[in-house]
Amino acid sequence: MKKLVHKESQWEILSQLGTGAFGRVVKAKKINCDGTGIIIDICAIKIIKKSVFTKNEIEILKQLDHPLIVKYYGYGVGEIDDNIYIYMEYIDGYPVSSILRKQPKNQFPEDIISKIVIDLALILSYIHDNERKIIHRDLKCDNIMLVNDNTHSCDVNGNCSRNGGGSAKSANQSFFTEDCVCNVNGSGTDENCKSCKLKSKPIREIQGSCESCGSDLEQDSSSSSSSSSSTINNGQSSTCRLINCIYSVSKKIKLIDFGLSKGCDGDSKYYSLVGTSTHMPPEVALRNNTACRKSDIWSLGCTIIEMAGGNLFEKDIHGKPKIPDHLSASCKNFIQRCLTIDPNHRDDIINLISHNFIDRNRINEEIKEDISKSKIQFDDEFNEIISPGDLDSVNEVVFGFDFNQTIIPGTMNSVKKIEFGGSFNKELLIDSLPSATSITFGARFNNGNKPFAIGAIPSTCKSITFGWTYNQPFYPGILPNSLKKLIFQEGGDFNRILEVGSLPSSITTLILGDYDQKIEKGVLPSSLTILELGGEFNQPLEGSIPDSVTSLTLGYRFNKALTENCIPPNCKFLKFGSNFNKDLSPGILPSSIETLILGYCFNKELVEGSLPLSITTLIYEHRDNQKKVSYDYKEVTNLSKDLEENEIIPLTPESLPESITKLTIGKNQNHVIEFNCLPPDLQCLKYHGGFIRPLIPRDLPSSITSVKLYNYNYEIKKTSIPKSVTSLQLGSRHNKFTQIQSLSNFHPNMRDLKIYINDDDIDIYNLKDIIPQTITSLIINGDNIDLPIGIEN
């Protein structure tokens, strides 16, 4: 949705729903329907000062479409003020935290907790999947809404009107009221009680039972005899136990507040200290690791403790929140798996869904019901002709390996996403997939060994992936102008010459598997932003890549000399393959580059000006990170020998721009760290190279927080590692660290330690007096060690 202009004259603010550090949220109603751009009459509007606004929350919300997540309608800029207005679904309900505070002992029954956790598991599996990769980063009871289903009238204090008690409201009204105390209790009218509007009243405990949920009701000894509340049996007002009654009729939550959420790419790093401190995972609180999808899992465990009445400020000896004793063994185990200190060993949501604390039958039913409306996946053995009506209303189809039947036009009119198995090699007929937006062909597909007819690929198609065998020409008009992404798998046969006009001007992503044809100027469209040239590509680049490309990957065989016109001027990400070893003279790399990756063969000296100041991430890859290349044994041996004979090239301040914050150096680069040579703002260093002396002060900058030294084997001195470092790795599986007595010299800021030592040195009780007590995560030879050392479970 485009940005709107928010006009106060078009909205009536009905109530304030909440306030926070960044703004406030109000309930608002349209009073002038013309020109608002919002089709919903009542919205929740988040109002944020433009000075603190980022588009992050909007970009996240636009990706989400799930019945258990708050809906996003659009956003606008204030017409007369300096605010941003985010229009969202108004949720008729209350935060779980509000209901929790009304409960005896501030805790929910475990069966209710389990139901809420199931909904949260469904939400997390949705936002964490590989399509969205979203981290919520603030999961807690305040951000979980229990939603009214408009069939039961019970207010936030538990006054249940279905049996005529507690409230004068009728049964078809909201069980979450916003009326004043007098009106709810039946002791006043709207005219004479406007002054007390929206006040809350204490929980009333009375005798009897709620007809809705069957909960026992007890007498409220403090209630006045003059109260005009409705009565049951003995004439006393009634209140049900809130959570049992409300959840039995609601059966639905919604997750809100994605203001702190982030997208991630598996290893994405977010060092910012955000979230709620009581629910914050250690990797975020200590700023020594990455905020990842598993960070939400820690918060899920804390949220369960919160709903169970636990005190999140009360920690055990490991720094984890204490789990309430009254919970079942199954629930406790579920929480323990959420609260694993090391995120690398913490369960993800897919593993937790299989835990016996979760009702797997309900999970399966929810997922199956969702999939049944949109997706069908066939077994590998299926190989029957699809008939008209077989796949009506199906949006996604995945065929197994054996399927190899012609798709008859009219049989897949609703299918938007289709994936063929490895055996499929029938010609794609015109109008056979009229609505498809994404098509993936298997390994043997070659379109019946003939080019596509114009119109065979539908005008709706946005993404096509070809397997290994496809090698047919693309004449102008074959690929539709709707196409955004075109992928040829690595190792595939496609190697046809691409002519001007064969690729539509709409393409933004092009991945050419093992393509090795010279690309003439004008062949690649100016819409292209992501280009990957496969492993076999080794052609000159000058003038062939459009200026629009911002991400460029060159395959392992590429080793052509570069000039100033080779790399596009807007390129931000540039990756060279393993073979590249040409000079990078000043001016070759544009000043737009932020991430540069050099392969393990690169061994040229970097002089001042070789690397632009825009670079923030520089990676020297080493052989272990490369895929196997098609050298024969002799070539590999000679290549390694040549590298070993080259002189050692020191890293110098002139060769590394000050802007770099992340640096990885491979073991074959023959570079060594020298005094004060690393960029001053460096935060993360992975160093596979050797050392010719111990680290001394100022070798590592004071900005650095994460250091991995795979071949370091000198004594650690108090000044060797800066106090800013909270995460450290010493040694590797092939290069053990033997100076273990010096580990006691770590500064107190160190939290995360990973070491590889000789098996003879692994004596836990000897290490007890060496490893500092401040360490909260310890991994020895790849195994996670329980802390503190020497404490038996």
Swiss-Prot record:
Its cofactor is Mg(2+). It catalyses: L-seryl-[protein] + ATP = O-phospho-L-seryl-[protein] + ADP + H(+); L-threonyl-[protein] + ATP = O-phospho-L-threonyl-[protein] + ADP + H(+). The gene is fnkA. It is an enzyme of class 2 (transferase). PANTHER family: FNIP REPEAT-CONTAINING PROTEIN, FNIP REPEAT-CONTAINING PROTEIN-RELATED. It comes from Dictyostelium discoideum (Social amoeba). The lineage of its organism: Eukaryota, Amoebozoa, Evosea, Eumycetozoa, Dictyostelia. Belongs to the protein kinase superfamily. STE Ser/Thr protein kinase family. The keyword Transmembrane does not apply. This is Probable serine/threonine-protein kinase fnkA. The active site is at residue 138. It comes from the Eukaryota. The keyword Disulfide bond does not apply. Keywords: ATP-binding, Kinase, Magnesium, Metal-binding, Nucleotide-binding, Repeat, Serine/threonine-protein kinase, Transferase. One of its GO terms (molecular function) is protein serine/threonine kinase activity. FNIP repeats lie at residues 403-444, 470-514, 515-557, 558-601, 691-733. Residues 11-358 form the Protein kinase domain. It holds the Pfam family FNIP. Its EC number is 2.7.11.1.
